[in-house]
Amino acid sequence: MGNIVVITGASSGFGALTARAVADAGDTVYAGMRHTTGRNAPQVKAAADYSAAHGVDLRAIELDVGSQDSVDAAIGRITAEHGRVDVLVHNAGHMVVGPAEAFTPEQLAELYDVNVLSTQRVNRAVLPGMRARRAGLVVWVSSSSVKGGTPPYLAPYFAAKAGMDALAVSYAGELARWGVETSIVVPGSFTSGTSHFAHAGRPADHTAEAAYEEHYAGLMDQVAEKLAALAPEGADASLVSDEIARIVALPRGERPYRVHIDPADDGSAEVSDVADRVRRAFLDRVGLADLLTVTP
């Protein structure tokens, strides 16, 4: 019997690729997205066409991670049809580019909502069922920016992803005794194959943005060019989706706590190794080493 898998933000990029990769492995996949009867209607059709052409079970579903009502309705429908959700992939996110000062506090709050609070909405809908069954997997799509090299003009996005990663780390320990596994997937700076940069938001304070542009002329273009140049040939976004599919397919108890897919090698893996080692040592010191592995 295959897994019932929910993927947020699955209209494009890592989400859409992951939905197809996991469905190809034989699982039933719900590709969550907004505006399924509007702007994302072509993506709904694309998912249905892929499902029919490849003989897999891939279904688009209306799931707006910014709305608890939408999340509850989607998870309620899936649970009514299958009785459970086995795997949840937190992929939904949004990026902004520009000088940090030029973003309003409200813009930072909106970004935090999409990248962090959205995971809490979905968790509150999905985790009660996983806890009741003492089984499940939560995959968090983080970012190498959390612990790796951080170029300028991406500060609000980096801060939000750091918040998401911190939440994932805490959830890992809190869910372990419930038998629910956590895997944190850390992509590097994939500048192609995703819609992050193409759909990135801009600062609302155009005066401040213009001042920075005058003083640091062309800096954002330089950052984009350098990030693209760091990635070796063949560094396709499917590396991330294929790794998520591999993790989902692993037997319970063998799924990794954290994995890096960073062809540019920005140092995130090295720093994460230290942080994760400190986490393990600390939990052992305070007598909570059992939280490092799921309870059968």
What do the predicted segments below correspond to?
Residues V139-G163, V169, G173-A176, G188-P203:
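Catalytic loop of short-chain dehydrogenase/reductase
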Residues G173-R255:
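SDR active-site lid
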Residues S11-S12:
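Conserved glycine-rich cofactor-binding loop
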Residues P99-A100, Q107-A109:
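Substrate-binding pocket helix/loop in short-chain dehydrogenase/reductase
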Residues N123-R124:
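A short, exposed helix-loop element centered on a Lys and neighboring polar residues
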Residues A25-V44:
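Conserved glycine-rich Rossmann-like NAD(P)H-binding loop of the short-chain dehydrogenase/reductase
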Residues G38, I61-A73, P105:
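The beta1-alpha1 cofactor-binding region of Rossmann-like NAD(H)/NADP(H)-dependent oxidoreductases
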